[in-house]
Amino acid sequence: MRLKDRVAVVTGSGSGIGEATAKRLAAEGAAVVVVDLNQEGANRVADEIRKAGGNADALHANVGNPQELEDMVRFATDKFGRLDILHNNAIRLYTGRVGEMSLEHWRKAVDIGLTSYWYATRCALQVMVGQRKGAIINTGSVSGLAGDYGLGAYNAIKAGVINLTRATAIEYARKGIRCNAVCPGAILTPPILKSRHSQPELARQTEAAIPMGRYGEPIEIANVVLFLASDEASYVNGTFIVADGGLTAHTGIPSVAGSGPDW
């Protein structure tokens, strides 16, 4: 087991990528704190981990509240005696054009998607520095590498996450702490699954734009997080891994050479 005797905290792990990651880390031997705003979701995931033979505790927390992030790290250390892995994954998506989004929604989006990542990292570092070892993995996005119509706040937040990752990595590398990010593309999380049913044409166009011709599965992102959390990534620091089926490898310009994805 790659993570035997290690302790992991995963935010936003009551569903989607966070759920897949919590289960994947637990399957490799980590004791996992399943953190989510949805208590029912957190309880379900923790129960499923335990039924599979793993070690997990559920924790209800609003990551937009700094005190609850402090309590989150304290919960992990009080329960398990240490903290080895932090996966910042929680997000709240607010849509709207840059010139039309309300200040209230902008601030809420930044609080959940960026400020919470910084503050959770800050809290975790207070433990990890003393241990002289730790791995922090942030969920970025391909939307942090380019713009999307109607997702200006999300684009800004995820770009911020990528550079927060880099800053953390260089500042704490000599303390034995690594910090990296995973940047997913279109993944079959609950919101995407819902939109596939309500907007089937958009789903078709999205799949057509992905060179691999399909959406990604949450487990495919969880596998990247597992790698970054493990000793197999011992010299990987301050970078991000894109997992998007080749989406960002393409210029977006239609084929001019008479060949396409099905040639």
List each language-model region with its residue ranges:
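Substrate-binding pocket helix/loop in short-chain dehydrogenase/reductase
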Residues: 97-98, 105-110, 202, 206
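Active-site helix of classical SDR
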Residues: 121, 157, 165
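C-terminal helical subdomain
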Residues: 181, 200-232, 236, 243-245
